Amino acid sequence: MAYDSNYTFPDPETSDKQGLLAIGGVLTPKRVLQAYSQGIFPWYEPGNPVLWWSPNPRLILIPNEFKISRSLKKTLKKPFKLTVDTAFQRVISYCATCSDRANKTWITSEMIETYTQLHEMGYAHSFEIWDGSELVGGLYGISLGHAFFGESMFHTITDASKVALHFLCSIMQSWNFDFIDCQLPTLHLMRLGAKIISRKEFLHMLQETLKYPDKKGNWSVN
């Protein structure tokens, strides 16, 4: 993995009660990869310094534990086209427009540039849901070892982001991935099968999954 050897993050256990661990620094692909490998992720508002987080507790989703409601089961029967890594920039741009962490836009232009570079490096991936030729839902995130770190989802029609998450879980399960990091607990994701674990347990799971080689490259699935 391409780490930033010129920067060392503090121990995640030293973060404050909200999970804030460090402030500042330049958002580069190598630094972001190093952060994820230590259970840390960037989250900040436009115009502010980069904030680095390692919350306790943490929310994860085991790929085979995704819960399908009756309404979603009906939606999954619709003739959507499902693709991977065919429209990364469009997905992250939609997510930036629709992002909703405390109803604030947090996907900055700097983040879009950095994660697009990570996509070109083979670490960041997008899952796309199409209704005909229209992109109606999707998500993106980072892959390291046998873990996928979900960043954001969007939908323009009902349940399309859930379809994207179900698609992600199906692919991750077929590749024997261990978990999807959902970062912060939300009722929405918990209803879909995500569960809360301690940061200590998360960091242990992370170190175990990082023993596997990274699945880099374009994941295009038609």
Curated annotation (Swiss-Prot):
Alphabetized PANTHER family for the sequence: LEUCYL/PHENYLALANYL-TRNA--PROTEIN TRANSFERASE, LEUCYL_PHENYLALANYL-TRNA--PROTEIN TRANSFERASE
E.C. numbers: 2.3.2.6
Naturally occurring in which organism (per UniProt): Legionella pneumophila (strain Lens)
EC category name: transferase
HAMAP family membership: Leu_Phe_trans
Molecular function GO labels: leucyl-tRNA--protein transferase activity
Protein family membership: Belongs to the L/F-transferase family.
Phylogenetic lineage: Bacteria, Pseudomonadati, Pseudomonadota, Gammaproteobacteria, Legionellales
Name of the molecule in the record: Leucyl/phenylalanyl-tRNA--protein transferase
